[in-house]
Amino acid sequence: MSASVRTYLEIMRYENCLMAGFAAIIGTLIAFNILTSNAPSSYSPGEFPLFSSVLIFLAVFLVAGAGNAINDYFDVRIDSINRPDRPIPSGRMKLKEALYFSYTLFALGTLLAFSINPICGVIALFNSLVLIFYAKTLKGTPLLGNLSIGYLTGSSFLFGASVFGLEGLKALFVLFLLAALAITAREIVKDIEDMEGDKMEGADTLPLRVGAKKASYLAALIGFLAVIFSPLPYHLSMLGLRYLYLVLLADLGFLAAIYQLLARNNPTKSSKMFKIAMFFALIAFIAGV
């Protein structure tokens, strides 16, 4: 007996897929605004690509859902202990069914992306491979797993910007970089926060490998790089003064997160501060055009 529609949506973690899709739309909007305001004479984005935006949303939604489904496929043993209510360990979905479902979503999402333009398609294909490799291997690899999450999260914005080809990627590269750095730093902080539980489960994370102190220094360094690079869009004349003012709030949040991590030894509060800072950084990009 095949799984229900509700079970398929559950294994996709459709709420996360919606967030990833909307992040791509935000990337399209920001890239469009930047290119419209600062477009070189040889390039103009024209009218806002509404139809392509719908396609990019669907492509990101499907690829993200595929990544979540295949993650459950490889995590079936762990989930049978920690999350027995998940679709596979609960018996509501067969193991092979989850695998075939994820491959179908990967294929549909990638085909949709290629229908927009080759750059969108290449990003979809590459991200699909990263998601498969992450679920199978990278998730249990110290630092590389954190970097993978940072890249994949930040690439949602690049995905949306790729509607405009290479010019779109150039316009959104700094936002991608800031998001990737901030997410990577926060992922390391979360691993520090979860050290006791991860140790009991036999997980191999960066803090368990090198110690909480060294991992904290690395997370702080990566977060500080996000602060250093944050004024770049203003200095490159991509975004205006509003961006600079608003991103300063984000920078204060990043610095507060670093302070909580290093001076107060409070990874839980640091993780929350990183999340708040990323929200202000996103607002700065939206409002800064």
UniProtKB/Swiss-Prot annotation:
Cofactor or coenzyme needed: Mg(2+)
Keywords, alphabetical: Cell membrane, Lipid biosynthesis, Lipid metabolism, Magnesium, Membrane, Phospholipid biosynthesis, Phospholipid metabolism, Transferase, Transmembrane, Transmembrane helix
Pathway linked to the protein: Membrane lipid metabolism; glycerophospholipid metabolism
Gene3D superfamilies: UbiA prenyltransferase (1.20.120.1780)
Transmembrane segments: 17-37, 50-70, 106-126, 141-161, 163-183, 221-241, 243-263, 269-289
Cytoplasm listed as a keyword: no
Top-level lineage group: Archaea
GO molecular function: geranylgeranylglycerol-phosphate geranylgeranyltransferase activity; magnesium ion binding
Membrane topology: Multi-pass membrane protein
Enzyme class: transferase
Keyword Lipid biosynthesis applies: yes
Subcellular location field: Cell membrane
The EC number(s) this enzyme carries: 2.5.1.42
GO biological process: glycerophospholipid biosynthetic process
Listed GO CC annotations: plasma membrane
Catalysed reaction, written as an equation: sn-3-O-(geranylgeranyl)glycerol 1-phosphate + (2E,6E,10E)-geranylgeranyl diphosphate = 2,3-bis-O-(geranylgeranyl)-sn-glycerol 1-phosphate + diphosphate
Coiled coil: none
Function: Prenyltransferase that catalyzes the transfer of the geranylgeranyl moiety of geranylgeranyl diphosphate (GGPP) to the C2 hydroxyl of (S)-3-O-geranylgeranylglyceryl phosphate (GGGP). This reaction is the second ether-bond-formation step in the biosynthesis of archaeal membrane lipids.
Homology family: Belongs to the UbiA prenyltransferase family. DGGGP synthase subfamily.
Protein name: Digeranylgeranylglyceryl phosphate synthase
